[in-house]
């Protein structure tokens, strides 16, 4: 359901494939969308220099998420993906129908769009990403503990 296109010079996807795939699989299972979406990783040096530059955006007509990766921490990139995936969920529900203005200030001018942004922040950044992060850390901690126990057993058996 999620296709990734890595058009970044840093090959952000290739160098972080396991974590990104884990996150997108988790999101696919936990978010309510029924249409495929594409995530495109792009570089933009000028945007990266702007302290209030664009980090990501969703194109509802193309069902495509663009993530700007230049100079960003992977955790921040994953948060952006999560936020934009909520916009994809909204699009699949039909919440974008009739929307025309997504220019500067749209979230302050349009009550419906403000609600959509609020949902994207709370459901995307707080719930989906945070739940993924906590579950991922818990599973990896359990795996490390199991490996330590296994090594201990092996050492005891070989002595």
Model regions and ranges:
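Substrate-binding/catalytic groove segments of enzymes
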Residues: 89-100, 128-136
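Short active-site segment of divalent metal-dependent hydrolases/proteases
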Residues: 82-90
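Auxiliary, metal-adjacent structural segments of Zn-dependent hydrolase domains
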Residues: 6-61
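Short, solvent-exposed loop/turn segments at secondary-structure junctions
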Residues: 44-47, 71-73, 128
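Post-HEXXH active-site segment of zinc metalloproteases
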Residues: 75-79, 91-122
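Short, contiguous pre-domain boundary segments
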Residues: 2-8, 101-105
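Long, well-structured alpha-helical subdomains associated
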Residues: 111-113, 117, 122-159
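Short pre-active-site segment immediately N-terminal to the catalytic Zn-binding motif
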Residues: 64-81
């Amino acid at each position: 359901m999620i296709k990734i296109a890595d058009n970044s010079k840093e090959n952000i996807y290739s160098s972080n494939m396991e974590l990104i795939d884990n996150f997108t699989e988790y999101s696919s299972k936990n978010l309510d969308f029924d249409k495929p979406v594409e995530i495109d990783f792009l570089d933009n040096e000028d945007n990266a220099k702007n302290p209030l530059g664009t980090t990501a955006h969703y194109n509802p007509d193309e069902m495509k998420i663009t993530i700007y990766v230049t100079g960003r921490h992977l955790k921040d990139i994953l948060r952006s993906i999560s936020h934009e995936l909520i916009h994809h969920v909204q699009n699949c529900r039909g919440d974008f129908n009739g929307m025309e203005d997504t220019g500067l200030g749209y979230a302050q001018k349009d009550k419906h769009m403000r609600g959509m942004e609020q949902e994207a922040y709370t459901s995307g950044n707080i719930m989906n990403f945070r739940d993924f992060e906590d579950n991922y850390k818990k599973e990896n901690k359990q795996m490390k503990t199991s490996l330590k126990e296994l090594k201990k057993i092996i050492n005891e058996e070989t002595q």
